[in-house]
A protein has these predicted regions:
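N-terminal helix-rich structural modules
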Residues: 44-231
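Bacterial signal peptide processing site
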Residues: 21-25
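Active-site recognition of the HExxH zinc-binding catalytic motif
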Residues: 399-413, 440, 445
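Post-HEXXH active-site segment of zinc metalloproteases
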Residues: 412-438
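Extended, compositionally biased alpha-helical segments that mediate assembly or anchoring
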Residues: 526, 530-582
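An active-site-proximal "capping" alpha-helix that borders the catalytic cofactor pocket
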Residues: 225, 433-450
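Contiguous, non-catalytic segments that form substrate-binding/exosite surfaces or channel walls
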Residues: 201-393
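Long, well-structured alpha-helical subdomains associated
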Residues: 445-543, 547
Length: 582
C-alpha cells in the first residue's frame, strides 16, 4: 500500500506523477519555492516541487482506484416538456449533496472549505479524495483518516459525538413518549441544556429541502406525465412534513420516461444504531421495453418466498406489485454518489408500504454494463482458475443484480421483541445492513437457480451464474469490510470456502468454484441468515459477522493480485453539464 511504502518507492511514484503533471508551478506552494530558490536556485525549486508531489502521491494513488467514466442516456425520444422537467430534477437532486455532507459528519463543510482554500498539492489531493469519500475518512480502508486527526464517529452526523448507545436507550426508557421520534428514520438527535432531543429532518435541513421542494413543483408543472406530477408534488410536501408514506406509494406508481428517486432512504451511514436515513437522488431515463421484458419476474415473488429453504413461520407475505424498472442514469447526488456507486436499488424501505404495494426494483443499466467491463470481468480473470473464466458472463451478472434486488423483498421482515412486533432493521440495529446485503446476494443466486428450474432461464446459465456470482463477491469485498456490502461479501466468501464450495490453489492463489457443492452451500447460508433475521437475534448477527465478515489471508492474497483494476468508478454526467477529464 502506498501509504506505507519506503521513501525510495514513494519517490518513484512521485516521479511518475510529476511526468504526468508536467511542470506547472501552481502545483507547488509559493513559499517553499521561494525558500528553495534562496537556498539552491532552480535545483532547490525542483527539490521542493518533488517533495510536495511525493507527499501527495499516496492520496493520488487512492484517487486512481476510482476510474472516471461517462454515464449518459439517449434523450432523443423525450418530449420537450419532459426534457425541461429533467433539468429541474437535476437541480433539485444537487441539493441533496450539502445535506449528505452534514449527515456524514457535522465538520465536513468547514473542513472541505479549509482544504479548498489551500493550494498545496497535498491539500488538493486530499480535497479530491474527500469529494469521492464524502468526508475525511477512507471508506475503503476501515475509515482510516486521511484529512483529519479525528476518529470516524460511528453515529456520523446523526447524534452528538459523545452520545453512547446506552445513553440513547436510557433516554428512551426514561421518556417513552419520545421513542417514536428518537427511533424515526428522519430525525437528528441533538443535545441541549435539558438533555437529548429529536429534531425533524424537515427542520434540520430546511435550508436545502425548501428549495428542492420548489424545484420539484416546477418540474411537476413542466411535465405532462400524470404519475410524475403526482409523485413530485407529494415528495415536495414530504420534504416539509417528514411524512414520506404517501409519496413513497406515488413513487411506486411512477410510469414515466423521466424518473427521479429522491429523499432519505438508506441507513448504512448510521453505524451506531442503524436508524437514520441519508438523503440521495437518482435521476434516470427509463427503457419501457426492457422493463416490460423483466416484469414477469415480479409475478414469481410469492413463489420465491415459498421456495425459500426456511420454515413457513419465517416467510413473509408482502404486496406483490413490485415493479421492475430498467433505466439509464443521467445524474446522482447525495448518498448515491458517495464512494462506491450502487448499480441497482430496491425501495422504499418502509415495511408498511412494502406490505401494501411491495417494492420497486430499479436497475441502472448503463452503470451495470460499465462496471462489468471495467471492473468485474478483469477481477474474474485475476481471481478465478483459468478453466472457469469462460463462465464469466455479463447477462448472468445482470440477472444476479436483478435478483439481489428482488431478494431484498423476501424473507423475514418483522420479529418479536418482548412480545412486540418489531421491524428486523430495528432489532438487529448496526448489524442489519451487512447481514441484509449478504442475504440479498446469496438469495439472489438461489432465486436465479430457481428460475432456471422453472424454465425462465436456460440450463446453460447455471454455471455462468454460479461462477459470476462468486467472482462478484471479490468486487464487493474490495469496498472494505467497514462497508455493508463489503462485509457481507466477506461473510459469503468465507462461508462458501468453509463448506468446500470454493477452493484455493495454494500455488497460484486462484479460486475454483465446486459446481457440485455450491448450490447446497448457498441454500444453507440463506437459511442461516433468514433464521437470525426471523429471531431478531442481534447477538447471533454480531457473532456471525465477527467470525466470517473479515478478509481471510487467501482473500487478501486475491485482492493483492488486483493491482491496476479500479475499485470502482467515478461517474461524470454530460446531461448535467459534467465533462469527463482527459
Amino acid at each position: 500500500m502506498l501509504a506505507t511504502m519506503p521513501r525510495s518507492a514513494s519517490r518513484l511514484v512521485a516521479l511518475a506523477l510529476l511526468a504526468a503533471c508536467g511542470s506547472d508551478p501552481a502545483l507547488v506552494p509559493s513559499e517553499p519555492n521561494k525558500m528553495a530558490a534562496d537556498e539552491g536556485g532552480p535545483h532547490g525549486i525542483e527539490e521542493a516541487r518533488m517533495n510536495a508531489q511525493e507527499a501527495a502521491a499516496p492520496i493520488l494513488a487512492k484517487i486512481q482506484q476510482f476510474a472516471p467514466v461517462e454515464l449518459s442516456a439517449d434523450l432523443s425520444g423525450l418530449p420537450d416538456s419532459e426534457r425541461a422537467a429533467l433539468d429541474k430534477l437535476i437541480a433539485a437532486a444537487r441539493l441533496m449533496d450539502p445535506i449528505l455532507d452534514r449527515q456524514s459528519w457535522a465538520g465536513n463543510p468547514a473542513l472541505r472549505d479549509k482544504l479548498s482554500r489551500d493550494g498545496a498539492p497535498l491539500a488538493r489531493a486530499k480535497l479530491e479524495y474527500f469529494d469521492i469519500m464524502r468526508g475525511p475518512w477512507d471508506r475503503q480502508d476501515h475509515n482510516t483518516p486521511f484529512a483529519t486527526e479525528a476518529p470516524h464517529p460511528a453515529g456520523a452526523g446523526f447524534y452528538p459525538e459523545d452520545m453512547s448507545v446506552d445513553e440513547f436507550k436510557k433516554w428512551i426508557a426514561d421518556h417513552p413518549d419520545q421513542r417514536a421520534a428518537f427511533e424515526s428514520l428522519t430525525t437528528v438527535i441533538e443535545r441541549d441544556s435539558l438533555g437529548l432531543r429529536a429534531r425533524p429532518y424537515a427542520e434540520a435541513y430546511k435550508q436545502w429541502l425548501g428549495p428542492a421542494a420548489a424545484l420539484l413543483r416546477e418540474a411537476a408543472e413542466l411535465s405532462q406525465n400524470p404519475t410524475l406530477k403526482t409523485f413530485l408534488r407529494a415528495r415536495a410536501d414530504a420534504f416539509a412534513s417528514d411524512d414520506y408514506y404517501a409519496s413513497d406509494k406515488a413513487w411506486m406508481d411512477l410510469d414515466s420516461p423521466v424518473e427521479i428517486t429522491i429523499g432519505p432512504y438508506e441507513t448504512y451511514e448510521d453505524e451506531l444504531l442503524g436508524l437514520k436515513a441519508t438523503f440521495e437522488a437518482f435521476v434516470t431515463v427509463s427503457d419501457p421495453k426492457a422493463s416490460a421484458d423483466l416484469a414477469r419476474f415480479k409475478n414469481y415473488l410469492p413463489d420465491m418466498e415459498q421456495h425459500l429453504p426456511i420454515d413457513d413461520v419465517m416467510k413473509t407475505k408482502r404486496g406483490s406489485e413490485s415493479p421492475i424498472r430498467v433505466v439509464d442514469l443521467v445524474f446522482t447526488a447525495g448518498d448515491a454518489r458517495k464512494s462506491v456507486q450502487t448499480i441497482a436499488f430496491n425501495l422504499p424501505n418502509d415495511e408498511k408500504v412494502r406490505a401494501e404495494k411491495g417494492a420497486k426494483k430499479v436497475l441502472l443499466r448503463n452503470l451495470i454494463a460499465t462496471k462489468f467491463n471495467v471492473i468485474m470481468r478483469p477481477i474474474g480473470e485475476r481471481v478465478l482458475d483459468p478453466s472457469q473464466q469462460v463462465h464469466l458472463d455479463d447477462q448472468a451478472f445482470f440477472q444476479e443484480v436483478l435478483f439481489h434486488e428482488l431478494s431484498h423483498s423476501l424473507g423475514p421482515a418483522f420479529t418479536t421483541v418482548a412480545g412486540q412486533k418489531v421491524d428486523v432493521r430495528l432489532a438487529l440495529a448496526g448489524s442489519y445492513s451487512a447481514l441484509e446485503e449478504a442475504k440479498a446476494d446469496v438469495m439472489g443466486a438461489y432465486n436465479v437457480l430457481y428460475m432456471i428450474e422453472r424454465g425462465e432461464f436456460p440450463a446453460t446459465m447455471r454455471d455462468k451464474l454460479l461462477v459470476s456470482y462468486f467472482a462478484g463477491l471479490f468486487r464487493s469485498v474490495r469496498f472494505g469490510v467497514e462497508e455493508a456490502h463489503g462485509k457481507g461479501a466477506a461473510l459469503q466468501i468465507n462461508r462458501l470456502v468453509e463448506a468446500g464450495a470454493a477452493t484455493v490453489d495454494p500455488s497460484t492463489g486462484k479460486y475454483k468454484v465446486d459446481l457440485g457443492k455450491i448450490e447446497a452451500a448457498i441454500a444453507a447460508l440463506v437459511r442461516d441468515l433468514c433464521t437470525i433475521q426471523h429471531n431478531g437475534d442481534k447477538t447471533a448477527a454480531e457473532a456471525l459477522l465477527s467470525k466470517y465478515g473479515q478478509v481471510s489471508p487467501d482473500t487478501q492474497r486475491a485482492l493483492d493480485s488486483l493491482t491496476g483494476i479500479p475499485v470502482d468508478v467515478r461517474p461524470y454526467y454530460p446531461v448535467a453539464g459534467e465533462i469527463l477529464p482527459k
